[in-house]
Amino acid sequence: MLKVQTEKGKIYSFIRDKWLVCTPEEEVRQNLVCWLVNECGYPLENMMEEYKNQYSDGRGVRKTRADIVIFRTREEKEKNYNAYIVVECKAENVKIRKEDFYQGTEYAQNLRAQFLILHNSRETNFYAIDMDKIPNKDDAFTQIVGIPNYSDIYDEKKVEDIKNKTKIFTREEFTSLLLRCHNIIRNNDKLSPEAAFDEISKILFIKIDFERRFKGTQVFTLDQFVKQEADYERFTRPTMRKQGIDKSYMQVLFDNTKLAYENDHLFEENEMIKIRENSFKSILTLLEKYNLSDTSDDVKGIAFEQFLGRTFRGELGQFFTPRTVVDFMTEILDPQEGELICDPCCGSGGFLIKAFDYVKEKIESDIQAQKDRFKTQLMSKHPEEMTEDQQIELNAQIDRVFKQLNSELEHVHGEKGDYYSRLDNLSYRSIYGTDANPRMARTSKMNMIMHGDGHGGVHHHDGLININGIFENHFDVILTNPPFGANVGKDQTIDEDDLERDEKRIAYYTDLYGTPYKKQLDDLKRRAQGLTVNGEKKDKERLLLNLYETGKMSTLTEVLFIERCLRLLKPGGRMGIVLPEGVLNNSNLQKVREYFEGKAKLILICSIPQDVFIKAGATVKPSLVFMKKFTDEEEKQYRSVVRKARNTVDAKYAPEIKELNDAYERKEIKHKSVYNSKLKEIETKKQEEMKPLIKKGFDYPVPIAKVDKAGITTTGGECDNELKDVLLEFRMYNTENPLWHKSTPNWDYSMNDDLRIIRSDNTNTVFLEE
C-alpha cells in the first residue's frame, strides 16, 4: 500500500520515481496518487504527471502540463493514445468550482478522456465526459459520484452505471435512505412520525459533527462506533459510574454534538437519545456510505427537505410549504444581494432556504463574471503564442486571482477579524425567521445547516412579537405561509419570557442595527411590564392584540400576520404571503381589506388549487398574495386622495348634517340616541361614498392569475406546473411596468500591480483574502 513520503522538505513522486520540493500543491497531488492506487487499483505504470499538452483557446496555441493523466494500459500510454482519466489538483481548501479548473476541462477535452477528476485539499469532484457534446462543456461534463475501479474499466455495464450515477441519483438515494432510517425507528421504537424525525436529526448531526472533526477524512461507520463503544465500556464508563454518572456511549456522542452546536440552539440542554441501540446501529449501517462532511450542500439539503416533506403530514403538515409554491413566490419577489429577508412563520425553513440559495446564485454569477473579466485582463498582457514557462506564469497569476475572488464565496468571518465575505453577509446579516413551534424552529435551523448555513437569524419565538434582528420597518422582502384559521386570544399577553435575555445577543444586534433596534427593544420591555408611554401602569398595554390595528377588527392569525408583515417591511418593501381565499372575499373581513389597501399596493394575486396543500392537511382554498408597502411618496399620495375624497363627501353632506343639528337644537329630535343614530347613518353613507372616490383617485392595475395545476397533486406527486407560465408573464409585465425599485449591490472590484484584488463599495475598501 502506498503512503505519502516526506523527508527534509521533499516529497516522493511515485509516478516519476524521484524526490520533489514539498509544496502544498505537490502534497495534494501525491495524496491523490496514493488514493488512486490503494483504493481504485490503478497501476503507477499507467499514469503520468506533468503530462505535456497543448490546446487552443481562440487566441492561439497554449502549451501547458496536466497534473495527472491515467491511461487504460501502459502500452496506450507509451503510444500516446487517448487518456482514460485526467486529473487537475489545487492546494486551496475551498469548495470546488468547475469553472476555476478551466485547464483541467481543456486537458480532458483535448486528450479525449472519459473521466475528469478535480481535486483540492478540501474535496474531490468527479465528472463523466461525453465527447459528442464537446465543446459545450456545460452539457459534456456531468458530475458523478466516483470513477470505475481499475478492475472494472473493461466492464461496459459497470462503467455505464457509474456514468449514470449522477448527483441527482445520489440525492434521491439519500432521501430514500433517510425514509428507511425513519421507518426503522417507527417500527423498532414505536415513536410518532414527528418524534422519529427528531431522533433521525440527532443521528445525522452526530454523524456530521464526527466527520467535521476529522475534516472529512473519516466516515462515521458502524465498525468505528462498535470499537469506540468497547473502549468506552472498558475504560471510561466504570470510572463515570463511580462518580454517579451513567450514560450509554450513544448518549455521550449526542452530548458532544449538543456541545458542538450549543450556539445554534438545535437541542435542549437535557435532551436525550430516545431510541434503542439496535436502531442506532441499523441506521449507522445505512448511512455509513455517506461522508456528510464531504457531501455537497445541495445533495444534503434537498434530500433533507424532501425527507421533511414526506414526514410532516397531518398536524405538522401546516409547517411545510410545497417547493413549487416556495420557488414561485421567491422568484416573483426576486430578492437581491444586500436586501434583508424574513419569514415570521418560517416552519421548516423552505422560504428562507430558497431565498438564501436564490441570492447565493446571484453572488456566484457575479464572481464568475469578475473571474472572466480579470482572466481576460491578464491574458491580454501576454503574447498570443506563449512559451511553456510563460503559460505556467499566466496560469499561476489566474489561479491567484481566482483564489482571492473565491474568498467571497467562503465563510471567513471569525477567522479574519472584521472582514465579511459576500457569503458571510448573506448568511449572517440577511436571512431572518421565527416560529412559535419549538420543533419547527429547530427543524428550520437544521434544514438551513444542511443547505449550507444562513441559520443564525432563525429564532424560536412568537412571530407576532419583535426579537433580535426581527423588528418593524426593517426588511426589504417578506415571504411567509402563516397559520390559517387560528385565533389570538383576547387575553394573550406579552410577557417577560418574550424578551431576549442574552446580553451578548442584545449587544450584537445593538451594534449591528443601532437606535432603531434599541428603540423597539425598549418599547417591548415597556409593554411586557404593562406600562404606557408615559410610564402609567395599565395592564391592557400587555395585550398582544393591542399591538395591531387589525386586532380591533379580527383575531384571526392570518389577518394579524398580514399586518405584521407590512409592519416588518421598510417603505417600498415587498411581501408574498399564502392566504385562505376568504381573506380576499369574505364580507365580514371587508374592513380588514380596506385597512391593507391603505397601507400597500397589491402587485399580484394568484389563485392556486386546493390540491397543493391537501397533503399538508389544509382544508381551504389558498391564494398567493403579493403586496408592496407604500413608499413615503405613495403614502403622501394616498393620504392626499383620502383627504380630497373626504372633503368632497363632507361638502355633499354638510347641508344634511346642518339640518340635523338644527333640528336637534330646536328639539324636534327629542332623544340624543335618535340624533346619534341618524348622525351615524350619515357617517356610514359618507364612508361608503368615499371608497369609490379613493379607488378612482388612487387607481392602479392589479395582475390576477388563476392556475389549475401548481406542480403538486393531492398525494404529493408531481404534475404540470402552470405557475411557471405565470412567472414568465409577470416578469414581462414587471419589466414593462416596474412595480418596485430594484436595488443592485454596489460592489466594485479592481486589481493592483501586485495582483491583489480590491473590493470597494460606498463605505469600505478591503483587500480580498489570499
Regions found by a protein language model. Name each.
Residues 22-27, 186-201, 274, 293-296, ...:
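Structural motif
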Residues 205, 212-309:
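Long recognition/docking surfaces used for binding and targeting
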Residues 184-185, 299-324, 330-332:
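Class I SAM-dependent transferase core
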Residues 1-115, 123-161:
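A short, conserved, highly charged catalytic patch centered on acidic carboxylates
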Residues 152-215:
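Non-catalytic accessory regions of SAM-dependent methyltransferases
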Residues 319-480, 484-502, 580-581, 592, ...:
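Conserved S-adenosyl-L-methionine
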Residues 6-17, 171-191, 282-288:
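Short amphipathic alpha-helical segments and their helix-coil junctions
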Residues 95, 148-152, 472, 477-770:
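A conserved structural/catalytic subdomain of Rossmann-like adenosyl-cofactor enzymes
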